A protein has these predicted regions:
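Membrane-proximal helix-turn-helix segments that form the acceptor-binding/catalytic region
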Residues: 61-65, 108-127
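Conserved acidic donor-binding segment of nucleotide-sugar-dependent glycosyltransferases
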Residues: 291-302, 310-316
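A short alpha->beta transition loop at the rim of the catalytic pocket in nucleotide-sugar-dependent
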Residues: 247, 274-276
Length: 349
């Protein structure tokens, strides 16, 4: 039985919320399921949020805690420098490192960055990717080796979704709940002269994104409602309620920011709740929406309008898309499959 150090921000809080049934276990990336199965011991370890040298030192010291495997659902390179340096020097060689990479592993912007990246990623035993494209780009850049790389299926906690939302309706409105790099101007323009209802839920600020401009649209159009929300468990649950009641989930993406699996959370939520999806083009997404016949991929306002009209005028077909979406979630994109895949990696090391 191996001891797994689950290293990341807020891990203990997420574990407690998950164990009490307040949130989906998807944010724990399979650690809850692995812990429940009892084949490995999972120790959640919350990284320090202190900035500067103090936080850096604290987080690097955490990586030295007694464990067989370090797991990071988000790879924070600066927090692994010490353990990776020790592994490179022949110390701590028995400690394995596994992480989930959400972007392409680039070569670094300067000499110091390149040195750190090479040190850290050479020390990883397995790097799991959400996107085949990001994985292949990383391999082409030779920042990781083929033996290190593996595609990871990820999705929602279907048992949680079914328990909280046992009945899903098919309302007369479309919903978009994304926070990261969303092109809401384009989406709103598609709805302005259409007799369709749109609900947008997002944060006013999200990292580099500033959605203050949405104030110009609030109360301007009778068919468009815009809500600025905070980050809380209550808000997350409310947004899921709106997704469960909507006709279709919309994922409008800023195309200049599409270099990773942007929008994946919105997509897997929609699939878990059996909803059709209309999304901007994203070649990095692991879900082929049109091939799986669970919705539409669009490129401009004209295509947005066409897809919206089809969903609106063909409710029976829209429901079939939603059924296929849920089926795909059950087969591939769910947290149980994710946990099994990660546990298989742990067992192989």
């Amino acid at each position: 039985m191996k001891k797994i150090l689950d290293l990341g921000f807020g891990r203990e809080t997420l574990r407690d919320l998950c164990n009490s049934g307040q949130i989906s276990s998807r944010l724990l990336y399979g650690m809850a399921e692995i812990s429940h199965r009892g084949n490995h011991i999972v120790i959640e370890c919350s990284m320090s949020s202190h900035s500067g040298l103090i936080g850096l030192l604290k987080n690097n010291m955490m990586s030295l805690k007694k464990a067989d495997i370090i797991f990071m659902s988000y790879i924070y390179e600066s927090s692994l420098v010490l353990i990776c340096l020790l592994k490179t020097l022949g110390l701590y060689k028995q400690k394995k490192i596994v992480g989930v990479c959400h972007t392409t592993v680039n070569q670094g912007e300067n000499l110091l960055d390149r040195i750190i990246k090479k040190l850290v990623f050479n020390s990883f035993d397995k790097v799991l990717f959400h996107s085949y494209v990001n994985m292949e780009e990383s391999l082409s850049l030779k920042t990781i080796k083929r033996s290190q790389a593996e595609f990871l299926y990820w999705g929602d906690d279907l048992s949680y979704v079914d328990k909280v939302f046992p009945i899903r309706s098919h309302g007369n409105f479309f919903v978009s709940t994304g926070r990261e790099n969303r092109d809401y101007s384009l989406l709103i323009n598609a709805f302005i002269d259409m007799p369709l209802k749109l609900e947008i839920y997002t944060n006013r600020f999200n990292y580099d994104n500033n959605y203050d401009y949405l104030d110009n649209y609030r109360s301007k159009y009778n068919n468009i409602d815009i809500y600025m929300v905070d980050r809380s468990n209550e808000t997350t649950l409310h947004l899921l309620e709106r997704v469960a009641a909507c006709r279709c989930v919309l994922v409008p993406l800023i195309q200049s920011k599409v270099n990773y699996c942007l929008g994946l959370t919105s997509i897997v939520e929609a699939m878990a709740l059996g909803k059709p999806i209309i999304s901007s083009v994203n070649p990095y997404s692991p879900v082929d929406i049109e091939k799986e016949e669970i919705g539409f991929v669009v490129r401009n306002v004209v295509e947005w309008k066409s897809a919206l009209q089809y969903i609106s005028e063909n409710p029976d077909e829209a429901k079939k898309m939603g059924i296929r979406a849920r089926s795909l979630a059950e087969k591939k994109f769910n947290i149980e499959k994710c946990s099994q895949q990660i546990e298989s990696v742990f067992s192989s090391l």
